[in-house]
Amino acid sequence: MHWAKCFEGIVSSCTLGLFLVAAAQTAEGQTEPVKPKAKTAKQSTMRPSSKASSAAMPNEEDWWKNAVIYEIYPRSFQDTNGDGVGDLNGITDRLDYLKDLGIDAIWLTPVYPSPDVDFGYDISDYKNIDPQYGTLADFDRLVAEANKRHIRILMDMVMNHTSDKHEWFTQSRSSRDNPYRDWYVWHDGKGQTATDKGVPPNNWQSFFGHSAWEWDEKTRQYYYHKFYVQQPDVNWDNPHIHEAFKDIVRFWLKRGVGGFRFDAITTLFEDPSMADEGVVKDKDGNPIINAYGDPTLDSSKTDNQPGLHAVVQEMRETADAFNSPKFPGTRVLIGETYLPNIQELLKMYGSPDKPEFHLPMDTQVGFINKLDVTAFRSKLIDVQTEIGHNIPLLLFDNHDNPRLDMRYGDGVHDTDIQRVLSTVLFASRGTALFYYGDEIGMKTTPPTRKEDVKDPIGVIGWPKEKGRDGERTPMQWDTSANAGFTTGKPWLPVPPSAATINVEAAKADPKSLFRWYQSLIRLKKTNPAFANGANLMLDTENTKVLSWMRQAPGAAEVVVAVNFTADPQIVNLAARGAGMQAAHLTTLLKTPGGPVPRSMESIKLGPYGVYIGELR
């Protein structure tokens, strides 16, 4: 799903370790595990305010509550057969790398058979593997090998639409009286007659430009497609669709998947009135024109409609009912939820008697797209305090958006800025989701010529919209040909930055971003305050430094301070709560080369510097 378009519409553990391991930093800046010092008798008496929230200590059933999830775009991760396209065996071959990084689960973007109009999100068969990625046997091997390493495989589930090559749609468009006709959304045109097709039923638009209605000459009706013409929307008012997708979910659960990420979930239903959507206007009252030359619509009739929550409840019930001793643990449901506020996000969790998503994506924090302390603090407070006992799912990046360097970087301090963002991601309460290559600082590399564009969004919208190829380039493993991704011609060019930005170089450098990710993930899993602690914002008037505390009953408190600027900063957190004045700090992690503070009264941070310390 195209995130930029979605936001445009909105605006108009694995089991915890048996012993605590803290991350300490050597004089050279390398992070390495050490056993913690014995706790002192005196601990801070500060406790969470009414605005602090907490989570239960994760166990095998609750693995997802403090998990680290890694998104893989399979065609760009690792190719093993030389055809230039990544495959399932390539992911299996790299599982030890992912285990070393510290992740708990892999989210795979679609690997089902597909004509690839939208690179897998146009599915023609939900119960098989596309030959370019491998076979069902290859998939089973991936699940089994991942399971040995305590890594779960999460599938992408696309229920809003299918490919127009899917057998359901082939039947549906064959005649008006076919049993599958009502499996999709068909409608007569305005002013349609026996000889004139009229015009589309209303002004609804595709996410990818122009009308969302396509005329079918054979059956003389329009069908609805929220995405590409080749991705007709299924009709969720038809009970057969409900049963068909529950059957698909069970098929993959039986193969051992750990859960699903539900794509474009808020667009399942449309307003039955078929009324036009409102046009979004600027301050002068003029329509805002989007990248495709169309007036921007408010999505009021095609997004987050009644009926959505009942469907999610059905899918949750289906997943919860499945239990296999071969693959124990909760099957987690993640929602791709573009919602305008925290109140709507809260609804996507459901209720105790009617649960919905375990982890609806919070897209408010990670897509601010500028280093604004006040905005980050406000959004983090919302997601940490306004969703009750539920677990936040934070993310900053994915396959539909430019990478972090383009959205947040300044071209000079990009690595330090990515340390800042990863600290917010991993040091906040909840589950963290990040995109392949973020851990080594891969850069957005968009095409410079239209003829090089692969993504249809770029083909349609060029030059204003260059598409998503820039964030989907091959994983950069080493300095060999094609960065170790393939022995053939890669489906997208390997960026020149691979000469210096690659896994091999990152693992050899104790100060690398990769080592920073490793250390943060280790802290998230093994430090009780990080694994089980509430979030409490500190120094809330500061517009340069974002600071917060993690607190868990019976555990030493941890403070985090992050400089959002290119200028050195000094923060005094000692006056922010009772008992903190006398606290001493034990450094858990800091930016390489950064100073070591002795107390809460003077924490010095370099440009985009980070400090994490435990109160003693």
Where do the PLM segments sit?
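C-terminal beta-strand-rich structural cap/linker in extracellular carbohydrate-active enzymes
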Residues: 597-616
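Signal peptide processing junction and immediate N-terminal pro/mature segment
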Residues: 21-37
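N-terminal secretory signal peptides that target proteins for export/translocation
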Residues: 1-6
